[in-house]
């Protein structure tokens, strides 16, 4: 039995072509006249390489004319030669959906990686789907409470919205995504789908182990197309994961969280594919279809009536340049941005969120309420004033400031440290259990802090803790009491003592101590 005959039995189609050209992951296939497959159709080729037989999946990307189609391979093309039979499946790439995908790892083609053969009999959906119609969308705006102080207070997330974690390499984007998976599963019992797009294989394995240890793997489906995969796979893996999430939203009426790490790699893979297809590059070498490809993905991530897909996307910023077309194009689709800063990271404050650079469309009294909005704006005002004073402190020293500004600086430093929090994803490294702080307690704590009720407490007492109970416990362990001070204004003498004129690092001397706390 020939390979073409076997494929006919598997796919139910007799539309068979042959390979005429192979250039890396780009494969040109010739079909009989009048039988050219449609764009995005999946094609199968049976090949043998070094005594290993495998089925290669190709996706039709271009019609070249004269019954020729140009395809992108989803796997390495080692062993593929001219003349090999290629069968049109008559449909696009599809992936398994349903409750059975939870607790398992899949690739972009829907093959189970942790249990080969698993899921073959599942219902399958095409990865190329239309977004919900306008009249199906949920008009209501609702906040998603995470239990992370800095997020809930200053950059509240939208249920059913799109949230981005911006940052350069090594500032904690993946750790924060792992933290959110833990929190959603433990605190809300929600379904999560994770898309590993072009990131390190080691990180995928670590995530698998951590989710299993935290007993949340049973509520999570993982789809990986890591950085060693061909660009076609890296470009499609986000769509495969999104399709699984859409099933839970549309068929099971569930709220779903979709995590994408890293959306920049999706753009990068699209750029590689565009170059391979011979398209003229656009700005900074990116593909001319960048905005279109991003829109096709992002428009499917939305809330329909009564259920939602909330997406959290890590965005690598090349060379920390936010004007780069990849992160700039992503901005247009977002409801909230959480920027992870290298300067905050260097102070040992985790999560390393820059509260002044991060934003949310729902930080508005009509959504979060007057009290939340007032406290958030006061915290931002104090931190912004502290930032404005940095140059003066660096040149003249803190002693040259007015008394009111000295007090504000000390208060801002306490706010900075109180925005840090011990995280569940870091328990094995810190030895401290992760903390979840209710929104009401977060607002109350920062309201008191911004009014000066805690000015008498040492800065280190605010570092990497949860709520007010943790603050009281840590302050008492350092010999201070919560009710010893008030808002009378005088900053603790130890904070400004010996900070002389011209000391360029006067306001950051506590940072090293924080790291050791």
Swiss-Prot record:
InterPro entries linked to this entry: AAA+_ATPase, ATP-synt_VA_C, ATP_synth_F1_bsu, ATPase_a/bsu_AS, ATPase_alpha/beta_chains, ATPase_F1/V1/A1_a/bsu_N, ATPase_F1/V1/A1_a/bsu_N_sf, ATPase_F1/V1/A1_a/bsu_nucl-bd
Catalytic reaction equation(s): ATP + H2O + 4 H(+)(in) = ADP + phosphate + 5 H(+)(out)
Role played: Produces ATP from ADP in the presence of a proton gradient across the membrane. The catalytic sites are hosted primarily by the beta subunits.
SMART domains in alphabetical order: AAA (SM00382)
Enzyme superclass (EC): translocase
Family: Belongs to the ATPase alpha/beta chains family.
GO cellular component assignments: plasma membrane; proton-transporting ATP synthase complex
Signal sequence coordinates: none
Organism this protein belongs to: Mycobacterium sp. (strain JLS)
Region annotation Disordered: where it falls in the sequence: 475-517
Record text on subunit structure and interactions: F-type ATPases have 2 components, CF(1) - the catalytic core - and CF(0) - the membrane proton channel. CF(1) has five subunits: alpha(3), beta(3), gamma(1), delta(1), epsilon(1). CF(0) has three main subunits: a(1), b(2) and c(9-12). The alpha and beta chains form an alternating ring which encloses part of the gamma chain. CF(1) is attached to CF(0) by a central stalk formed by the gamma and epsilon chains, while a peripheral stalk is formed by the delta and b chains.
Gene3D superfamilies for this protein: 2.40.10.170, Bovine Mitochondrial F1-atpase, Atp Synthase Beta Chain, Chain D, domain 3 (1.10.1140.10), P-loop containing nucleotide triphosphate hydrolases (3.40.50.300)
Main subcellular location: membrane
EC numbers, comma separated: 7.1.2.2
Name of the protein this chain belongs to: ATP synthase subunit beta
Molecular-function GO terms, alphabetical: ATP binding; ATP hydrolysis activity; proton-transporting ATP synthase activity, rotational mechanism
Keywords linked to the UniProt accession: ATP synthesis, ATP-binding, Cell membrane, CF(1), Hydrogen ion transport, Ion transport, Membrane, Nucleotide-binding, Translocase, Transport
Subcellular location: Cell membrane
Binding site for ATP: 167-174
Start-end of Basic and acidic residues biased regions: 475-484, 495-508
Membrane topology: Peripheral membrane protein
